Amino acid sequence: MGLPWYRVHTVVLNDPGRLLAVHIMHTALVSGWAGSMALYELAVFDPSDPVLDPMWRQGMFVIPFMTRLGITDSWGGWSISGGTVTNPGIWSYEGVAGAHIVFSGLCFLAAIWHWVYWDLAIFSDDRTGKPSLDLPKIFGIHLFLAGVACFGFGAFHVTGLYGPGIWVSDPYGLTGKVQAVNPAWGAEGFDPFVPGGIASHHIAAGTLGILAGLFHLSVRPPQRLYKGLRMGNIETVLSSSIAAVFFAAFVVAGTMWYGSATTPIELFGPTRYQWDQGYFQQEIYRRVSNGLAENLSLSEAWSKIPEKLAFYDYIGNNPAKGGLFRAGSMDNGDGIAVGWLGHPVFRDKEGRELFVRRMPTFFETFPVVLVDEEGIVRADVPFRRAESKYSVEQVGVTVEFYGGELNGVSYSDPATVKKYARRSQLGEIFELDRATLKSDGVFRSSPRGWFTFGHATFALLFFFGHIWHGARTLFRDVFAGIDPDLDAQVEFGTFQKVGDPTTRKQAV
């Protein structure tokens, strides 16, 4: 049977045993990929510096998902938070990866068994002797089981009742750890940044799924609805399943790109909007102001800023700075961060503090402009020196560092001042090692960007798949050229034109 590539899946039409087999094999492939990818990432992951070289800077993709579900320790003796562990047990990164690979192997064997033993009695209709599936009943079974799993995850795993809890952190991604979460049943549960909503929504959705599953198991669909929605056709199942998948993909693309409690910045990196809104910059200035109010010196106030917080306030960690075809991790772009140089404070010769205007997300280059606290331009690095009025040399700009490696160091040399002014456009200034990985200096996106791009793209493709298969199943009679209300038996050769009673052949 010579089928074109886009029609090969018709071989499992009207063949429930082999339809089951190919789905089990698909599960084997997905689980096997997840386990293998986890082992590869663990082989290349460097856990030595969770502050300046976290998993998202290294381009890890599956490790963050394991971590947010409660896995933090490795058989290699390290913990994701930077400590050491002696007995991580079976539920370590390697243990979970191994479990997926073992499960993949079992699914592989099950798929082969079901492919060979496809003609099982359970798939046969007693009345006709032909293969058939009771699709409404199967829908009820799956809905019930999915509801049980959903409820169990929310009520036991997330709450810590029987499980580790989930990754929870503060709004600035500094104190993250795995902990039990109490369900949030009030209005706050609808805030996408409240972890309690994850528990309560899984409990509620799971309960609804269990009840809906029992309903569909005990109540048969009305005949008109059954026929109208083509509930006896397996392509209806395909169409509605694709709809569920593309809807979920669109939702998670949104929660990943815009941020939520399910996508902590410690695991996936900051969002672009945190750079656009100066989110971390405001928090840093708030902490420094509080320090000054407590009679700390400027140097002491800046020295109390966590290096982790300063690192978030750097444009190289903005997932929107990567290019679509720039493969590789962030570390392969601007390099591995080694240390924070400190916060540069610029002043003109009149003693005014100047602030470098930061580069917007979608600019590759941006003029170096220094403004005072009222937003008035006081200095710049001019394009045409002959016409300049505000050059660093003319204005007499100096720079002094507070906190970090250059704490207390000041420069008045114009070339050095301009160098640090340019680097201040990109946020806080870090020493970056570009030699180790031969980093090319071109920004890359974080796993947050890759996940969003992948899921939004496939969601769009699956949306068209839903429309395609939905139309095929709803208008199957139209495409086949047969009127569903035709009373006469349609047999080959009865009519000159198939299904047209006006062309009935006369028996000779």
UniProtKB/Swiss-Prot annotation:
This entry's comment on the bound cofactor is:
Binds multiple chlorophylls. PSII binds additional chlorophylls, carotenoids and specific lipids.
- Any Pfam family the entry gives: PSII
What keyword terms does UniProt attach to this protein?
Chlorophyll, Chloroplast, Chromophore, Membrane, Photosynthesis, Photosystem II, Plastid, Thylakoid, Transmembrane, Transmembrane helix
The reply to whether Kinase figures as a keyword in the UniProt entry is no
List the InterPro entries: PS_antenna-like (IPR000932), PS_II_antenna-like_sf (IPR036001), PSII_PsbB (IPR017486)
What compartments host this protein?
Plastid, Chloroplast thylakoid membrane
The domain of life for this entry's organism is Eukaryota
Q: How does it sit in the membrane?
A: Multi-pass membrane protein
Identify a single GO molecular function assigned to this protein: electron transporter, transferring electrons within the cyclic electron transport pathway of photosynthesis activity
- Gene Ontology CC annotations of this record: chloroplast thylakoid membrane; photosystem II
The membrane spanning regions, by residue number, are 21-36, 101-115, 140-156, 203-218, 237-252, 457-472
| Gene3D superfamilies cross-referenced by the UniProt entry | Photosystem II CP47 reaction center protein
**Which terms does the UniProt entry file under GO BP?**
photosynthetic electron transport in photosystem II
- Could you say which protein family the record assigns here? Belongs to the PsbB/PsbC family. PsbB subfamily.
Q: Please name the HAMAP family in this protein's record.
A: PSII_PsbB_CP47
Query: What is its quaternary makeup?
Result: PSII is composed of 1 copy each of membrane proteins PsbA, PsbB, PsbC, PsbD, PsbE, PsbF, PsbH, PsbI, PsbJ, PsbK, PsbL, PsbM, PsbT, PsbX, PsbY, PsbZ, Psb30/Ycf12, at least 3 peripheral proteins of the oxygen-evolving complex and a large number of cofactors. It forms dimeric complexes.
Q: What does this protein do?
A: One of the components of the core complex of photosystem II (PSII). It binds chlorophyll and helps catalyze the primary light-induced photochemical processes of PSII. PSII is a light-driven water:plastoquinone oxidoreductase, using light energy to abstract electrons from H(2)O, generating O(2) and a proton gradient subsequently used for ATP formation.
Specify the protein name: Photosystem II CP47 reaction center protein
